[in-house]
Amino acid sequence: PPTSSRRQRQMCIRDSIPTAKFWKVSSLEEAKKIIHSTSIPLVVKADGLASGKGVFIPDSKEECVRATESIFNGKFGNSGNMVVLEEKIHGPEVSVFALCDGKKYILLPSAQDHKRLNEEDKGPNTGGMGAYSPAPLLTKNYLERIIKEIIEPTINELNKKNIDYKGVIYFGLMITKSGPKVIEYNCRFGDPECQTIM
């Protein structure tokens, strides 16, 4: 799966994989127009890799602008050359891991991590403050839906593009009222989730 947040979203939209509505922006002025014209709460993401710290969940339009400005001002180097503004979706997060041989996959136990720095899900996101496995909210029905709607279409897309990927695929998901949605892909284990799975 691509390491760019923008390309991940584009792949999801193209293959009807459930994800959040998004906008890609390449300047602060472009971002401000979207931030001030939309009525839905937004999440701000650096487009490239940022060690799990490139996501901001602002509480206001002003915080949204400040987060976007900090990314464009070089907070994450070249990973912040483009910014993704994303619809803020609600629900608990869950991490699902698949080991892929290029064609087939096997699932590992699910996990839930806690990213916020402070208690009661407050403060900035971190690389991970703690985790547990398996994720109790991931019922058999949800897992079947995740396999059908997210995991298999993702693996099929890699195969269609002749991407012979061998390794772990980390599906960062949010369980919303309308079902599971992709919030991120990674080609690595999550940390600290991996510690609880092992």
Residue ranges and their predicted role:
Residues 6-7, 49-51, 115-117:
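Short gly/pro/ser/thr-enriched loop/turn and capping motifs at secondary-structure boundaries
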